[in-house]
Amino acid sequence: MTDTEVLRKDNRYELRVDGKVAGLAAFLDHDNQRVFHHTEINRAHRGEGLSTVLIEAALTDTVGAGMRIVPVCPAVKAYLEKENGFAESVDPVTDEIFDWLEAKFQKR
């Protein structure tokens, strides 16, 4: 059995397996919304169900912080389509959100 933990660091949640980074869920906060725009699991750990562990922990932390979830990332969106426990905390992805994200990334 592998030891996993999910930690929030800056604008991402890191999934650690046996103390090493194995994946991340990246986000940017927009007012009271946490906009998830990218999720990634390292190749060595794909197919182990770790994206579910990562996304569930990230969404639980988001809701616990009083933030709304905006699932731009396809992996987060797919998770939410299967798991309805977060339905009341999800905001739709709008053109305004896409424009805001684009502007944020152009500044980097």
Label the predicted regions:
Residues 40-46:
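A short, internal acetyl-CoA/4′-phosphopantetheine-binding micro-motif in the GNAT/acyltransferase core
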Residues 2-24, 33, 60-108:
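Terminal substrate-recognition subdomain of acyl/acetyltransferases
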Residues 47-59:
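Conserved acetyl-CoA-binding loop-helix of GNAT-fold acetyltransferases
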Residues 29-37:
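A conserved beta-turn-beta hairpin within the catalytic core of GNAT-like acetyltransferases
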Residues 36, 50-53, 71:
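Generic alpha-helix structural propensity
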Residues 25, 39:
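Conserved GNAT-family N-acetyltransferase fold
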